[in-house]
Amino acid sequence: MYFAKEDRYEKMKYAYCGNSGLKLPLVSLGLWHNFGDHSNLESMKDILFTAFDNGITHFDLANNYGPAPGSAEKNFGIILKEDFGKYRDEMIISTKAGYTMWEGPYGDFGSRKYLIASIDQSL
């Protein structure tokens, strides 16, 4: 079981994101590489735990991150559920959509149908 370091917020500087009132760490962790199904889940945990222990609270995903597409979100979800759950409210988790995800005319880019389906799948 993972327990975050108590001094984690002393190790990072945070700044407001525009006029939103939301503070973000000056460093975020993107999960494009090393979080797909080709990677070891324990290595993913080590990366995430080290980042969080050093005050990184923003994790950036996308619906097509992998490989395979979608696997980074799936793997992050597993770790969030199994190890990070009690810290969820201390995190900002962002995702985005726009690249090809499935066959047919609705599987890519920015149509309303594509974006709603991508958001549903990301949740």
Predicted features by range, described:
Residues 102-123:
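Glycine/proline-rich, positively charged
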Residues 1-92:
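N-terminal binding-site loop/beta-alpha segment at the start of enzyme catalytic domains
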